[in-house]
Amino acid sequence: MIQIIYVASPESQQIHVWKLDSIYGLLELIQVIYTHGQAQPMAVHPNKRFLYVGIRPNFGITTYRIDQIGLLADHGTIGIFSSPTHLISDKKGAFLYCTSYRNNTVSVIPISMSGMLLDSPIQIIEGLLGCHSANIDKFKKLLWVPCLKENAIRLFNINSFGMLTSYDPSIIKINVGSGPRHMIFCDFDCYAYVINELTSTVDVIKYNNFQKIPSIVQTVSIIPKNISINRCWAADIHITPNGRWLYCTDRSINIISCLEISKKTKKLKFVGYQLTEEQPRGFAIDYQGKFLVVAGQKSNCISLYKIDSDNGTLTMLSRYSSGKGPMWVSIITLNCK
C-alpha cells in the first residue's frame, strides 16, 4: 500500500506528484506535469483511478487517469461556463459538482462509466453569492454549499439523476460577517464543521435524517488568545479519520490550529497551534491520521507533519519546494501490487 500526494500550483501551471515514505517521514517527487492553465481545485474519483482538476483562466476541468503507482496521464479537458473554485464527486462517482465563487454558480457534470467527464454541465444553479465549496453529507442525499457573501449555507436535495433541487429549509444562516468557506463532516455522528473565512471561526452544526432544520450548536475561534490579529483570513479545514482532531489554517498569521472534538458532544476545544508555511491555503490528512501536508501559497513550499494521536500536536518532518503558488493538496492511498 502506498500514499500519493497531489499538489496543484497554479502560478507555475503544474501538478507535483509526491510519494509518502511513512517510515522516514519524507516525500519523494515522482512526477511533475504541466497543466492547460492555472490548476486549482482538485477532486479524486471514488475509485481512485481519476483526478479532476479545475483550470483557469480558460475555464475547464481536466481529467487525469491515475495509474497503479499514482502517476497521472492527461485524458482531456472539457470547457465550462464559470471559473472553478471547488470540485467534489458524488459517492458513486457518477456526477461532479463544481462551485464558482466568481460566477456564483454550482454546476452538475455527469461522469461516464469510463471516468471521463461529459462535454458540458447538465444543470447550472445561479445566484449563490460567493459559493465557495460543495459538500455531501454522510446520508449522501444533500449538497451543502457555503456561500461566503450570503453568510449562509445553501442546501440542495440530490436526486437519483444527480440533479439538484432546493431542500426545505433551503438555507442555514451563519453569523453576519462570518463568510462560510469550507466544511467537513464527522463520520461517526451527524455533525458538520464549517470554517468561516472572515472571522476565523468554526461553526458546529448538528443535523440528521429526521431533524428538518440543521442547527448551529457552537462557534469557536481558531485564533490563539495570545496572538493579536488585524485581519481574519481562514482557509481550510479537515478532521482526522478517527474523528478526534480537527485542524484549520489561517493565512493572515500563517498557522495551523488544532481543536479537539468531544467524543460525547462533538463540540470543539482549542488545544494549540503550529506556525507553518506562508499563506497556508490548503492541506490534507492521510487515511491513517498520522500525517498532514500543508501548502504555502506564498512560500512556494509544502511541509509534512507528524500528527501526535494523543494530543494532536504537529511535528514537522520535512519541507519541499513545489512549484509556484501551491494551493490544493489531495492525498490518496493505492494498493500497489
Swiss-Prot record:
Pfam families: Lactonase (PF10282). It is an enzyme of class 3 (hydrolase). GO terms for cellular component: cytosol. It catalyses: 6-phospho-D-glucono-1,5-lactone + H2O = 6-phospho-D-gluconate + H(+). Pathway: Carbohydrate degradation; pentose phosphate pathway; D-ribulose 5-phosphate from D-glucose 6-phosphate (oxidative stage): step 2/3. Keywords: Carbohydrate metabolism, Glucose metabolism, Hydrolase. Its EC number is 3.1.1.31. One of its GO terms (biological process) is pentose-phosphate shunt, oxidative branch. The keyword Transferase does not apply. GO terms for molecular function: 6-phosphogluconolactonase activity. InterPro entries: 6-phosphogluconolactonase_YbhE, Cycloisomerase_2, Lactonase_7-beta_prop, N2O_reductase_N, WD40/YVTN_repeat-like_dom_sf. Belongs to the cycloisomerase 2 family. Catalyzes the hydrolysis of 6-phosphogluconolactone to 6-phosphogluconate. This is 6-phosphogluconolactonase. It comes from Blochmanniella pennsylvanica (strain BPEN).
